[in-house]
């Protein structure tokens, strides 16, 4: 998936697990455009992860072995915390 194909990335953000949608969609909608290309690639790679892995990582029940993905999880958590709850 290309980092500038926002419609495909948006679709990939919709996971089918409400908890993941609540974590990933606001980050994509509010923060994706501010990321540099390297971070955009890491985010797209993160979206290729399995839902159970994403859920566990975002809920702090483990972490990715890949350093870039680990940093992206941390960035998502930080930005979402700083932004606060959003209406879905």
From Swiss-Prot:
Protein name per Swiss-Prot or TrEMBL: FAD assembly factor SdhE
NCBIfam families in alphabetical order: PRK10878.1
Superkingdom classification of source: Bacteria
Gene3D superfamilies given in the database record: Flavinator of succinate dehydrogenase (1.10.150.250)
Subunit structure: Monomer.
Native species: Pectobacterium atrosepticum (strain SCRI 1043 / ATCC BAA-672) (Erwinia carotovora subsp. atroseptica)
Cellular localisation: Cytoplasm
Keyword annotations from UniProtKB, A to Z: Chaperone, Cytoplasm
Major location (coarse): cytoplasm
Pfam name, any one: Sdh5
A single Gene Ontology CC term: cytoplasm
Family statement: Belongs to the SdhE FAD assembly factor family.
Functional description taken from the UniProt entry: An FAD assembly protein, which accelerates covalent attachment of the cofactor into other proteins. Plays an essential role in the assembly of succinate dehydrogenase (SDH, respiratory complex II), an enzyme complex that is a component of both the tricarboxylic acid cycle and the electron transport chain, and which couples the oxidation of succinate to fumarate with the reduction of ubiquinone (coenzyme Q) to ubiquinol. Required for flavinylation (covalent attachment of FAD) of the flavoprotein subunit SdhA of SDH and other flavinylated proteins as well.
GO BP annotations listed: succinate metabolic process
Coiled coil location: none
